[in-house]
């Protein structure tokens, strides 16, 4: 196998892999910590550490008391929590650097284990990584699927080639990691197709592979909650379906028109890949079964754009065959030029990282400050600081907020109980205000703001006008970002709630905040 790499790539092929791995690690490690749900993941991990167990009922929101809540990503959340509490933002960047390197290396390992051609292995690994960082990018549990699913394919390959025990152990381990990392854990069973495309289908091996996955899926505290867990996350909800404002839940082909150029290119490649493979490189059985898997990935992408990653992982064997059909560079000088060109992929991604870094708030992200470089941090921080210092918040106060603010606030001001956060499991009476609405929907839904004690919302939101018009509410502070795209928000409180707490609220003032956010200090000068 190594002889193939020396012949096709060159005698320095190992150094090329090292350089590409380092480039991918750096590109991943420098990616900004801007995922909107990172704050929610850290808060969930904090709750698990405090309680010593995973939650089964709603722990954060007053709008769904006692309703089921499953922290199905608890393993990844604890990993991020450990890194953050140990080394702050640097710890999260380091974890992501290793994850990014793993997303590249696991596909390389799959290619070598599957006897793909060296250049097919490199091309598929780089394309997989490019889609991984373009679509997932930030620190989030879904990123770990870029490691576990390729290794599930490798486990299937080992079993087909006679390494049954090693394949079973690897398949079981990847199923355990994935079921405790992401809701779409059944994708680890996709590689069972590998046993069925053989000229004589290996039914016994396929059954063993499925058993290994099934046993792995049971290794979770939510093993007996799968049906309910799927129900509350995938059934009818205002934030699931055509009205959603959640970008990753938007139907894939609707999102295509305004998606990033990298997502459009990846979509076109995946659409064309079955038709780019010469007939001699696929048997009829492979064309049918791998094609069905490709269609399944296409369906998931059509349902929600976040299905793009699953579509990619389902299409790995087809991508390898398509890449193998590309003519290889024959002359040594051409091989060297091609090898150097592959290094431009992580370098190009690295350049895009620096562009994104320019738009990230500068702050002190530690457990003590509870700040995170979320896109909404710039406008929320002055309001959070005011609430800490002037409202003397005790646990249980009801806060009304909006979908885009909720996840950050759950982490930043954990004493409040919030009406909504970044999860799509809320009843329509709450989530309806966050979905697209038309005149055919009847009166505009604003959510349960009248039942809250305080409210934090964008000034351009319709609820802000309702709060200003309601005599029982008082505006306490306005936060305006220096850059218009960062928005403006307000903090309101019920007058009776303020009175019962003995708080005499001052007249509302306005704070302008740039992207250089100071760490919270003493409350003497809020």
Give the label of every model feature segment.
Residues 388-430, 452-459, 492:
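Short periplasmic/luminal acceptor-recognition loop of GT-C membrane glycosyltransferases, typified by
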Residues 94-114:
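Transmembrane-helix motifs of polytopic, lipid-linked glycan transferases
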Residues 63-90, 94:
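Short hydrophobic/aromatic helix or loop-helix immediately within or flanking a transmembrane segment
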């Amino acid at each position: 196998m190594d002889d193939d790499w020396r012949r096709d790539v060159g005698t320095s092929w190992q150094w090329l892999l090292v350089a590409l791995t380092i480039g991918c690690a750096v590109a991943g490690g420098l990616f900004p910590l801007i995922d909107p749900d990172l704050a929610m993941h850290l808060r969930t991990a904090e709750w698990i550490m405090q309680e010593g167990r995973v939650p089964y009922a709603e722990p954060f929101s007053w709008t769904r008391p006692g309703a089921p809540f499953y922290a199905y990503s608890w393993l990844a959340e604890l990993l991020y929590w450990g890194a953050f509490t140990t080394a702050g933002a640097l710890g999260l960047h380091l974890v992501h650097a290793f994850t990014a390197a793993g997303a590249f290396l696991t596909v390389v390992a799959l290619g070598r284990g599957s006897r793909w051609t060296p250049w097919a292995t490199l091309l598929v690994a780089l394309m997989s990584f490019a889609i991984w960082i373009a679509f997932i990018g930030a620190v989030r549990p879904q990123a770990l699927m870029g490691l576990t699913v390729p290794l599930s394919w490798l486990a299937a390959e080992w079993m087909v080639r006679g390494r049954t025990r090693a394949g079973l152990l690897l398949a079981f381990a990847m199923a355990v990691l994935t079921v405790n990392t992401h809701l779409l854990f059944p994708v680890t069973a996709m590689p069972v197709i590998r046993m069925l495309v053989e000229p004589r289908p290996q039914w016994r091996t396929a059954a063993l592979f499925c058993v290994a996955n099934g046993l792995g899926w049971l290794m979770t505290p939510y093993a007996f909650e799968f049906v309910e867990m799927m129900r509350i996350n995938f059934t009818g909800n205002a934030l699931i379906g055509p009205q959603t404002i959640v970008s990753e839940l938007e139907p894939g082909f609707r999102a295509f028109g305004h998606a990033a150029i990298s997502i459009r290119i990846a979509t076109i490649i995946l659409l064309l890949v079955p038709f780019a493979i010469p007939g001699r490189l696929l048997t009829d059985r492979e064309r049918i079964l791998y094609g069905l898997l490709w269609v399944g990935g296409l369906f998931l992408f059509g349902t929600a754009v976040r299905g793009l990653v699953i579509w990619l992982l389902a299409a790995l064997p087809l991508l390898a065959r398509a890449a193998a059909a590309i003519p290889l560079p024959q002359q040594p000088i051409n091989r060297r030029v091609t090898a150097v060109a592959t290094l431009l992929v992580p370098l190009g991604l690295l350049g895009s990282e620096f562009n994104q870094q320019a738009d990230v708030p500068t702050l002190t992200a530690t457990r003590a400050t509870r700040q995170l470089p979320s896109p909404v941090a710039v406008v929320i921080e002055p309001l959070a600081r005011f609430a800490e210092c002037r409202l003397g918040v005790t646990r249980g106060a009801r806060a009304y907020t909006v979908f885009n603010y909720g996840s950050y606030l759950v982490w930043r001001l954990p004493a409040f109980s919030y009406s909504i956060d970044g999860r799509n499991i809320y009843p329509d009476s709450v989530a309806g205000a966050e979905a697209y609405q038309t005149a055919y929907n009847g009166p505009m839904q604003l959510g349960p703001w009248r039942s809250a004690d305080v409210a934090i919302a964008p000034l351009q939101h319709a609820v802000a006008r309702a709060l200003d018009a309601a005599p029982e509410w008082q505006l306490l502070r306005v936060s305006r970002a220096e850059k218009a795209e960062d928005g403006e928000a307000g903090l309101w409180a019920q007058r009776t709630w303020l009175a019962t707490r003995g708080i005499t609220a001052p007249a509302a003032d306005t704070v302008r905040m740039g992207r250089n956010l100071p760490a919270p200090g003493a409350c003497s000068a809020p």
